Amino acid sequence: MAKFQPRIADDGRDDGLKEKMIQVNRVTKVVKGGRTMSFAALTVVGDGDGRVGMGKGKAKEVPVAVTKAMDAARRDMVKVSLKNGTVHHNVTGEHGAAKVLLAPAAPGTGIIAGGPMRAVFEVMGVTDIVAKSLGSSNPYNMVRATFNALRRSTTPSEVASKRGKSVEEIFN
C-alpha cells in the first residue's frame, strides 16, 4: 500500500486552488482471464481560505486517476468558517472506525496533525490547529472523518441565532 506522500500537483489549471495527493493505491480486479490492474487516487483541493474538497479517482494509469480525483474534489467542496487560521471550537468527526478530534490552537502553534489530516488543513488555509486521530488509520476514512468534523463546526453567530441571543450574550 502506498504511504502518505503529500505533494502539490500541477495539471495546468489556473483556478487558484491548492492540490495535494494523499494516496495512490494499486488495486486488482480478478477475472476469469487473469488480473486487471488499476490505480485509485485520493486527493484534496482547497483555496487557502476555508474551502476544501476531497476526491477519489480510479483509472488504468496513475496520472489519469489523479486527474479524475482532482476533478471530483473540485465538484465536492465545502466552506468552513475559520477564526484567525483555526477552527472556532473543539469538534469531533467520525467515519467508519476512524474518529478525529479537532481543537483550536493559539497563533504560532502550527498544524499539529498526523497523516492525511495535515494535507486537508494545509490546502484549506488553516495555520494553527491541534488534531488527533483515533481508531482506523485508513487515509480515506481519516479524511472523511475530518470533513465530517469540519461540517459540524459552527460559528458564534450561528450559535447565537439558534439560541435567539446576540453574539455578545453568548460570550458573557
From Swiss-Prot:
One of its GO terms (biological process) is translation. Part of the 30S ribosomal subunit. Contacts proteins S4 and S8. Belongs to the universal ribosomal protein uS5 family. This is Small ribosomal subunit protein uS5. With S4 and S12 plays an important role in translational accuracy. Located at the back of the 30S subunit body where it stabilizes the conformation of the head with respect to the body. Residues 17-80 form the S5 DRBM domain. Pfam families: Ribosomal_S5, Ribosomal_S5_C. It comes from Methylibium petroleiphilum (strain ATCC BAA-1232 / LMG 22953 / PM1). Keywords: Ribonucleoprotein, Ribosomal protein, RNA-binding, rRNA-binding. PANTHER family: MITOCHONDRIAL RIBOSOMAL PROTEIN S5. Transmembrane segments: none annotated. GO terms for molecular function: rRNA binding; structural constituent of ribosome. Signal peptide: none annotated. One of its GO terms (cellular component) is small ribosomal subunit. It comes from the Bacteria. The N-terminal domain interacts with the head of the 30S subunit; the C-terminal domain interacts with the body and contacts protein S4. The interaction surface between S4 and S5 is involved in control of translational fidelity.
